[in-house]
Every structure is written in structure tokens, then in C-alpha cells.
């Protein structure tokens, strides 16, 4: 099954979701380079608070890059252009949060996110994103809570890391 693409969701849903974090989604014309794309098109790009996507950008990529913006500290956000950087803990926080946020995109949801992450090649020591999320992410949950990015019920807190 191919991964879900940006042109297969309501773009207003993604924009509304990310506005809660002060982000803007900007579309890029077909076949054009995507500004801020670390991995190159069709992967999403990130520069400041702007998430760049094309119609062929995977939704998991858009949410992953957005979650980098959410999970990094303000100092890095101020200088953000293309390379989100971050350490191992932050990368895991990004992956966990993108799964939570996927539930707010009706066409996606976490089950589709799990499939798309596995299909794209995200690597987890238990063999799948779902197994990692459900059985091996206690440290990630603690990290996200420490920075108040999720609440005690593991729901997005709709705030940026400070």
C-alpha cells in the first residue's frame, strides 16, 4: 500500500492543526524543489515556522518535520533552516508526537501512520512503529511530558518546547 500523500488529505486540516503551534503550511508547485527539505523532494521542508509541502509529499513526512519544530528548543527554532538536528531522545519524541497528531487528520489516523512509517523505513528495535509506540516508548513519553508537549493522558498539549 503506498503511503498517504498531501494531495490525499484536506490541506485545511493540516494547516489548522499546525496553526495551533504557530506554524504555516506552504504548498510548492509540482516538480519544483521543496525549500528546507533535508532529504530532498518529495520530503517536506522546514524553514523557521514554515512547513513546505508538495502534492506528492507524504503526510508522515509533513508531520515528522512539523514535530521537529515543536520538539526543538526556542534557540534552535530561531535559526531553523532545513536541518532540524536534534538528539536521539528528541528524534524519538518527534516520532511519537507525529503518531499522536496523525489522529487529528481524518484521512490518516494512527493505524495508517504506523503502516506508512513502517513502509517508508522508519526503524524501531521491536520491528514496527506500532510495537515501539505501544510497548517500548516509556522513555519517550517521559521526555515529552518533561517538556510539557503531551499531557498526563498522552494527548498533545498544543505548545512548543521552551
Describe the function of each predicted region.
Residues 1-45, 52-56, 100, 104-105:
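Auxiliary, metal-adjacent structural segments of Zn-dependent hydrolase domains
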Residues 36, 70-100, 114:
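Post-HEXXH active-site segment of zinc metalloproteases
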Residues 60-74:
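Active-site recognition of the HExxH zinc-binding catalytic motif
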Residues 87-89, 119-128:
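Short, mixed-charge aromatic SLiMs
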Residues 101-117:
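Short helix/loop segments within enzyme catalytic domains
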Residues 123-162:
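Pan-zinc metallopeptidase signature
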Amino acid at each position: 500500500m503506498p503511503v498517504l500523500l498531501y494531495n490525499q488529505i484536506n490541506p485545511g486540516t493540516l494547516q489548522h492543526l499546525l496553526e495551533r503551534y504557530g506554524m504555516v503550511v506552504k504548498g510548492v508547485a509540482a516538480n519544483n524543489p521543496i525549500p528546507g527539505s533535508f532529504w530532498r523532494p518529495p520530503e517536506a521542508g522546514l524553514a523557521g515556522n514554515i512547513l513546505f509541502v508538495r502534492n506528492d509529499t507524504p503526510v508522515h513526512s509533513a508531520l515528522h518535520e512539523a514535530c521537529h519544530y515543536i520538539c526543538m528548543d526556542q534557540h534552535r527554532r530561531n535559526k531553523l533552516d532545513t536541518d532540524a538536528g536534534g538528539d536521539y531522545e528528541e528524534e524519538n519524541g518527534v516520532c511519537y508526537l507525529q503518531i499522536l497528531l496523525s489522529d487529528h487528520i481524518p484521512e490518516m489516523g494512527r493505524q495508517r501512520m504506523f503502516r506508512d512509517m513502517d513502509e517508508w523505513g522508519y526503524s524501531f528495535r521491536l520491528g514496527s512503529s506500532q510495537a515501539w509506540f505501544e510497548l517500548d516508548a516509556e522513555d519517550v513519553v517521559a521526555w515529552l511530558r518533561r517538556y510539557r508537549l503531551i499531557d498526563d493522558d498522552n494527548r498533545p498539549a498544543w505548545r512548543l518546547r521552551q
